[in-house]
């Protein structure tokens, strides 16, 4: 199991388009992935769950990934956050 903290840095936070990219990315992996912040924990493969986090710019999200492809999944998710969901260019 891997745990890591990622910060939402894109201007609009985890809005619908960014959430869809996150869910699509994580759905490619078999590992179970949860995101938590502000006392809420959700499945990273659920659009509604991720939207419920209401994560705005600057929000720190704890990521927990468990499974065979956890390292690859964490790398993909980290890159998505680092690239600001390819929005703030």
Curated annotation (Swiss-Prot):
Pfam families, alphabetically?
Answer: PTS-HPr
Protein's name in the database: Phosphocarrier protein HPr
Q: Show the stretches that span the lipid bilayer.
A: none
Cysteine pairs forming cystine bridges in this chain are none
Q: Which Gene3D superfamilies does the record cross-reference, listed alphabetically?
A: HPr-like (3.30.1340.10)
Which family is this protein grouped under? Belongs to the HPr family.
- Please name the source species: Xylella fastidiosa (strain Temecula1 / ATCC 700964)
Q: Which InterPro entries match?
A: HPr, HPr-like, HPr-like_sf, PTS_HPr_His_P_site, PTS_HPr_Ser_P_site
Question: What is its subcellular localisation?
Answer: Cytoplasm
- Gene Ontology CC annotation, any one: cytoplasm
* Keywords per UniProt: Cytoplasm, Phosphoprotein, Phosphotransferase system, Sugar transport, Transport
Positions annotated as active site in the UniProt record: 15
Please, one GO biological process term? phosphoenolpyruvate-dependent sugar phosphotransferase system
Record domain HPr: where: 1-88
Known regulation of activity: Phosphorylation on Ser-46 inhibits the phosphoryl transfer from enzyme I to HPr.
Is the keyword Transport in the record? Answer: yes
Modified positions (Phosphoserine) in chain numbering? 46
Gene coding for it: ptsH
């Amino acid at each position: 199991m891997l745990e890591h903290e990622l910060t939402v840095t894109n201007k609009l936070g985890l809005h619908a388009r960014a959430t869809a990219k996150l869910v699509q990315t994580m759905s490619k992996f078999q590992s179970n992935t949860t995101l938590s912040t502000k006392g809420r924990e959700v499945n990273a493969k659920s659009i509604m769950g991720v939207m419920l986090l209401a994560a705005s710019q600057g929000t720190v999200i704890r990521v927990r990934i468990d499974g065979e492809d956890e390292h690859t999944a964490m790398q993909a998710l980290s890159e998505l956050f680092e690239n600001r969901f390819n929005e703030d260019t």
